[in-house]
Amino acid sequence: MGKRILVQRRGRGGSQFRSPSWKRDGPVRYPPLGVISGKGYVVDILHEPGLNAPVAKIVTENGVEFFNYAAEGLYVGQVVEIGKGASPKTGNIMILGEIPEGTMIFNVEKRAGDGGKFARAGGTYAVVIGQKPEENKTIIRLPSGRTVEVDSRGRATVGIVAGGGRIEKPFLKAGKKYHRARAKAWKYPTVRGKAMSPYAHPHGGGSHQKGGTPVPKTAPPGQKVGFIGSRCTGRGCVRARAQQKQ
């Protein structure tokens, strides 16, 4: 008798597939608009399991407490300026429309009050490249190189997210990778369906492993696994598409 395959178990949402929310200190986002302004104090810099950058715990003058990604060079006890009139110094949270061109920023709000959407990974930053005051828009260049327009009334933090160079250090051991995946609720290791027995996966079985064929889009539920209706897959596919564009 067959058994439920991994993607079906993941879809059910068992505890081993859920992110361990009890390990989190809190959401890393700005408070709603109008709640914070003036000055805040960095009371602690925390290691957050599941995130790839240190998190700064900030308390404002009126007692509001929130979490933001720590900038490179930020330290406990530092005073950060928040909101209108803040100066473009590392760690300060500024209004996008007041940030000078060429400034490096992170945790950028796409819409005013959404808490921050862009440039949040360790070592990343966006750059302000222009302002459109008449349209309330700020033009920024994202870490990917793409240029976007965001609401000038939104907020961003000046500087670069701490934790850069993280991906340059190799894992060396499978156990290290296991613990990283466990912190993020990733399933590790991943096993190919072709390597399984026939009771465990529709692609399993056979005396020898052979290259499979894509599952057609007209296949019934339960047979639709892996790459469905794909023309090509893998690194060669990406290379071929790039050559076609040229």
Swiss-Prot record:
InterPro entries in alphabetical order: NA-bd_OB-fold, Rib_uL2_dom2, Ribosomal_uL2, Ribosomal_uL2_arc_euk, Ribosomal_uL2_C, Ribosomal_uL2_dom3, Ribosomal_uL2_RNA-bd_dom, Translation_prot_SH3-like_sf
One Gene Ontology MF term: structural constituent of ribosome
Region spans: Disordered: 197-227
Keywords in alphabetical order: Ribonucleoprotein, Ribosomal protein, RNA-binding, rRNA-binding
Gene3D superfamilies the UniProt entry points to: 2.30.30.30, Nucleic acid-binding proteins, Ribosomal protein L2, domain 3
Annotated coiled-coil segments of the chain: none
Covalent S-S links between cysteines: none
Pfam families: Ribosomal_L2, Ribosomal_L2_C
GO cellular component: cytosolic large ribosomal subunit
Biological process according to GO: cytoplasmic translation
Protein role: One of the primary rRNA binding proteins. Required for association of the 30S and 50S subunits to form the 70S ribosome, for tRNA binding and peptide bond formation. It has been suggested to have peptidyltransferase activity; this is somewhat controversial. Makes several contacts with the 16S rRNA in the 70S ribosome.
Protein family (similarity comment): Belongs to the universal ribosomal protein uL2 family.
Name the record gives this protein: Large ribosomal subunit protein uL2
Species annotation: Pyrobaculum aerophilum (strain ATCC 51768 / DSM 7523 / JCM 9630 / CIP 104966 / NBRC 100827 / IM2)
